[in-house]
């Protein structure tokens, strides 16, 4: 909590049950790098976490040079963020490694590797 006390689950508490687990739909902005990576505006990615971006910070991200480029279907949860005018920067709430394999790399990993190769040249 705000005082630093660790909350503990008890039989009569409602703590817990907040895990975002499994495939969740994410809507991508069309003018974003992630839209170019996936080549579509709606994706499903696997989650396993209890974390969310505080909605009070959304406007601050945009004014400080970050773009919210992926959100939940209801636009309540931030799923992906890019930095404006950066050749390749991406923050995401999901786990792209869950759906990547050696024969069929995840679009995020493929894009990152391609970008590093171009940058190195």
Regions found by a protein language model. Give the residues of each.
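Amide-donor transfer/coupling interface in amidating biosynthetic enzymes
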Residues: 1-121
């Amino acid at each position: 909590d705000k005082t630093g006390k660790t909350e503990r689950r008890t039989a009569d508490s409602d703590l817990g049950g907040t895990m975002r687990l499994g495939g969740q739909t994410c809507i991508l902005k069309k003018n974003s790098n992630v839209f170019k990576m996936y080549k579509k505006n709606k994706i499903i990615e696997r989650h396993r976490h209890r974390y969310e971006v505080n909605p009070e910070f959304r406007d601050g991200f945009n004014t400080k040079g970050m773009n919210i480029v992926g959100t939940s279907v209801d636009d309540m949860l931030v799923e992906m963020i890019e930095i404006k005018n950066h050749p390749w920067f991406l923050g995401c709430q999901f786990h792209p490694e869950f759906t990547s394999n050696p024969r069929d790399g995840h679009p995020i990993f493929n894009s990152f590797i391609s970008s590093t190769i171009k940058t190195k040249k």
